[in-house]
A protein has these predicted regions:
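Alpha-helical segment proximal to the catalytic Tyr-Lys
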Residues: 127, 171-175, 232
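Active-site helix of classical SDR
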Residues: 122, 158, 166
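Conserved glycine-rich Rossmann-like NAD(P)H-binding loop of the short-chain dehydrogenase/reductase
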Residues: 30-44
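C-terminal substrate-recognition "lid" of short-chain dehydrogenase/reductases
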Residues: 134, 178, 212-241
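Residue(s) in the substrate-gating loop at a strand-loop-helix junction
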Residues: 142
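Substrate-binding pocket helix/loop in short-chain dehydrogenase/reductase
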Residues: 98-99, 106-111, 204
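Conserved glycine-rich cofactor-binding loop
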Residues: 14-15
């Protein structure tokens, strides 16, 4: 399969939405390069889920906030695999607090990991894709980047920045037949949302018309479609998976 399958990379594939995208993409026939930074054991679990279901892939480790590390590892991947078919830029963190309560490090860490990673991960992979005149780029943002959330000024800024960057990049790459789209998940059942206390969860659920959290697989199914040949005329879009929250 690996010789024939289209090859993609998914950052933040060790859990949550990233894991779901990696697993579902493998089921759809893609060779999936699963990125992780610190969570090697969890990334190995993702790869195991892929291989036990008949898929193929590999692991790669780098810090998405470290530009030099990204370039070195991604250049090596290109040398090994050639131009990738798809890039799913998904890795992200939160450091929630009121605006006045945020520290400079809280701000910088979220911007570096969530927004700078868009440049750090995608730019080294774009030129090989452009030479092939084909490919798919998906950036995972958040409804927080569309509507803004209390206590998430840094996170909302980073996710809004992703939307703007993806829209601009889509225009630049359209003539090369590379689509660039953004997925904006709402409240999804992940480790990140599991940390929210029960009282806060009840309040959040009241704001969602569908009155439930989404599942990572519901985001993944959209990502797999956007990776496909069938999505060749869809670009520069922001698609929310949020149960109608905005």
């Amino acid at each position: 399969m690996a010789d024939e399958a289209k090859k993609i990379i998914v950052t933040g594939a060790s859990g949550g939405i990233g894991r779901a995208i990696a697993v579902e993409a493998a089921k759809a026939g893609y060779y999936v390069i699963c990125h992780y930074n610190h969570g090697k054991e969890k990334a190995e679990e993702t790869l195991s889920l892929i291989t036990t279901s008949g898929g193929e892939g590999e692991l790669v480790q780098f810090n998405v906030a470290d530009r030099a590390d990204c370039k070195a590892k991604l250049d090596s991947l290109t040398e090994k695999h050639g131009a990738l078919w798809g890039v799913v830029s998904n890795a992200g963190i939160t450091r929630d607090n009121t605006f006045v309560g945020l520290t400079g490090e809280d701000w910088d860490a979220v911007i570096r990991t969530n927004l700078d990673s868009f440049f750090n991960v995608i730019q080294p992979l774009v030129m090989p894709m452009a030479r092939k005149k084909k490919g798919r780029i998906i950036a995972v943002s958040s409804v927080s980047g569309i509507m803004g959330n209390r206590g998430q000024t840094n996170y909302s800024a980073s996710k809004a920045g992703i939307i703007g960057a993806a829209k601009a990049l889509a225009v630049e790459l359209a003539s090369r037949h590379i689509t660039v789209n953004t997925i904006a998940p709402g409240v999804i059942e992940t480790d990140m949302t599991a940390a929210i206390n029960e009282e806060a969860k009840k309040i959040i659920m009241q704001t969602i018309p569908m009155a439930r959290a989404g599942k990572p697989e519901e985001v993944a199914s959209l990502a797999v479609f956007l990776l496909s040949e069938s999505a060749s005329y869809i670009t520069r879009q922001v698609i929310a998976v949020d149960g109608g929250i905005h």
